[in-house]
Amino acid sequence: MANLKSIRDRIQSVKNTQKITEAMRLVAAAKVRRAQEQVIATRPFADRLAQVLYGLQARLRFEEANLPLLRRREVKKVALLVVSGDRGLCGAYNTNVIKRAAERSKELKAEGIDYTFVLVGRKAIQYFQRREQPIDATYTGLEQVPTAAEASQIADELLSLFLSESVDRVELVYTKFVSLISSRPVVQTLLPLDPQGLEAQDDEIFRLTTRGGRFEVQREKVSSATQSMPQDMIFEQDPLQILDALLPLYLNNQLLRALQESAASELAARMTAMNNASDNAKELIKGLSMTYNKARQAAITQEILEVVGGAEALK
């Protein structure tokens, strides 16, 4: 009977854990929806900004745009902005992006280029602090749905490093959202900005939907800045001055999008991890229930044999 009680207690414990993992899965799914809604909400501003920049860049195509954020110089030191999460229970999300950042730092070191880290998220901070890596700034406690104010705070630090020539290039290491079950860490140059990179490019918006009782992602192709400004438009200010003023906004927008994709990737990874944990709990409960029933059946059979044996002994 002691064995039966132990199995019964374990079944109850697994059921309680399953309730927690299922709740975490649903919470993550709701937050993925919020992240999706924020991407859609910021899209009009991003479209208009890209359109203006595209038009200005086309207008200045044959001019020497010697602007601080576009100026390239010999690379002696690089700032690596690494975007990770504050918490675990999200599969390999943190491990993968930290691993890619560590690989990139080794690549720079092999090329004889110095580097420093700007870290977002406790997981990256803990990892690189333990290894005594050079760290210029850290950020924790960002919202699960990143805001423009948070992106602006980080962008200001990066601009300060670049414009003061403390670093010659800024690279971003973040997790690009692909699907609910797939994401990949990527490295992207943030500064100096590439004027050719301001041209319009197709983009995607992800939408979390349900089908057959399961979550899935629908991807919608959108086009940014497909139309430039009219060529006969007259500027009160010099187009170069306007471009100089708008480039920091463009940087903020790029950074905000990266934070949003990283957050969506983390939430999707957590949702998948909790879904797998719930499925594993179901299988474990099923196995434990079978073990419990077999043990209970054996105990009942033993009791019957003892009763029959006792009755035979009395004859």
Swiss-Prot record:
UniProt xrefs under Gene3D superfamilies: 3.40.1380.10, ATP synthase, gamma subunit, helix hairpin domain (1.10.287.80)
GO terms, molecular function: ATP binding; proton-transporting ATP synthase activity, rotational mechanism
Subcellular compartments: Cellular thylakoid membrane
One Gene Ontology CC term in the entry: proton-transporting ATP synthase complex
PROSITE patterns xrefs: ATPASE_GAMMA (PS00153)
Domain of life per record: Bacteria
Coiled-coil regions listed in the entry: none
Broad class of the protein's primary localization: membrane
Pfam families assigned to the protein according to its UniProt record, in alphabetical order: ATP-synt (PF00231)
Keywords from the named record: ATP synthesis, CF(1), Hydrogen ion transport, Ion transport, Membrane, Thylakoid, Transport
Membrane topology (UniProt): Peripheral membrane protein
Family classification: Belongs to the ATPase gamma chain family.
Record note on quaternary structure: F-type ATPases have 2 components, CF(1) - the catalytic core - and CF(0) - the membrane proton channel. CF(1) has five subunits: alpha(3), beta(3), gamma(1), delta(1), epsilon(1). CF(0) has three main subunits: a, b and c.
Biological function: Produces ATP from ADP in the presence of a proton gradient across the membrane. The gamma chain is believed to be important in regulating ATPase activity and the flow of protons through the CF(0) complex.
HAMAP family noted in UniProt: ATP_synth_gamma_bact
Protein name (record): ATP synthase gamma chain
Organism in which the protein naturally occurs: Cyanothece sp. (strain PCC 7425 / ATCC 29141)
Lineage: Bacteria, Bacillati, Cyanobacteriota, Cyanophyceae, Gomontiellales
Originating gene: atpG
